[in-house]
Amino acid sequence: MEKQSGALTASGTMAVCVKMGIPVAITCGMGGIGDIKGEELCPDLPALQQIPVVLISAGPKDMLDRKATIDWLISHGVKVIGTERNYCTGYVFCGEKVELQGKAENSTETVKPPMLIINEIPEERRIEDREILREAIAEGKRAEKEGRYFHPAANGKIDDCTDGYSSLIQLRGLIANMKVAETL
């Protein structure tokens, strides 16, 4: 039996949620706009616009253009807000500050699709060495050239370089997003 990825994208999770009548989907990292083969515009973005489910995420992955991703969502009618603040700075690494449309309110009246709620991994828990990100992007590009998927290769490199810490903070981020969903 050949090994295959069992990952489910944010858009896939949203599609399952709408079929099951679940109004809020959670993920940790999400896709966006970037130079990843076949994901120049990740399907997560049109899904946020078209699928009637609110998504809670720790934000677009660090190898993507976060500002272009947020701008695309806003320009296509998706409300993008943060849980703790009205901007985001990255996913598992810290980057440039990108303005959002506000902060989440604990009211079901204000939480409705199309909406992305960004609940970032706390900055003090993120990976500080951005050289690891550069190495991960290079590994992902190498995988693309070999006909493999970018994200598993890049994520694996980050995990290897951090002795599993990357996976740990992403798991904690996913759990934190579940807790946010419980308050809605």
Q: Each PLM stretch: what is its role?
A:
Residues 1-23:
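Ligand-binding beta-strand-loop-alpha-helix segment within the catalytic cores
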Residues 7-10, 36-49, 54-74, 103-106:
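Active-site glycine-rich loop that binds ribose-phosphate moieties when present
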Residues 19, 26-27, 32-37, 62-65, ...:
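Short, well-ordered, mixed-charge alpha-helical segments that flank or form enzyme active sites
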Residues 19-23, 29, 48-53, 75-78, ...:
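Short coil/turn connectors at secondary-structure junctions
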Residues 29-32, 58-61, 78, 83-88, ...:
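Short, ordered loop/turn segments at secondary-structure junctions
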Residues 68-75, 92, 96-99, 131-138:
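Short, solvent-exposed amphipathic alpha-helical segments in soluble enzyme
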Residues 90-110:
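Anionic-ligand binding region
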Residues 111-175:
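A C-terminal functional module that forms or caps the active site or interfaces directly
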